[in-house]
A protein has these predicted regions:
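Intrinsically disordered, low-complexity polar/charged tails and linkers
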Residues: 1-127, 132-136, 140-162
Length: 162
């Protein structure tokens, strides 16, 4: 599973004083995009981040640009994906997932060839799971929970693979 995109909010020690007027201020540096809204001048939204290492690089870059310390980093959303070439019986997975206390499964082959696994618990990602065993995880914020979800999906692939 590979992290494809991450959105984070970085909280600055002091108010950012940029003459941005009533509209948001967008700053593009390297592959990152930083957005500052006038109603929250202590917060900087960062996008275009592809790894946790890049998140640290974005933080250092921001500290260098504004000459002040980032006091807190909050991960708002992540997007992971994994491409597999297995063959998974989604009907069996759907039956199995009816008893899950973590995810609610939605599977309607006429609408979408894959399965949606919607979280029942806070901070868990939404998972799109297709019959090849490929999956994407969207919205998770906690790295430990994301690792648990990855292991969970891999167990589903092992258990229901044809």
């Amino acid at each position: 599973m590979k992290l494809r995109n991450l959105k984070a909010t970085l909280f600055m020690k002091n108010k950012i004083s940029i003459p941005y007027g009533p509209k948001k201020f967008i700053l593009k540096r390297e592959e990152f995009t930083f957005t500052i809204y006038p109603h929250s001048p202590y917060m900087v939204n960062a996008t275009g981040i592809k790894s946790f290492q890049e998140l640290e690089e974005a933080q250092e870059l921001l500290e260098g640009i504004f000459h002040q310390q980032v006091i807190k980093v909050r991960i708002d959303s992540t997007f992971y994906s994994q491409k597999n070439f297995d063959n998974v019986d989604l009907n069996q997975v759907y039956s199995f997932m009816k008893n899950s206390d973590t995810f609610y499964a939605e599977y309607n082959i006429e609408l979408f060839a894959g399965m949606y696994l919607h979280p029942k618990k806070e901070n868990y990602p939404t998972i799109l799971f297709v019959r090849t065993g490929s999956y994407t995880m969207m919205g998770g914020r906690d790295e430990n929970i994301l690792n648990k979800c990855e292991m969970f999906v891999n167990r589903l692939i092992e258990k229901f693979g044809k």
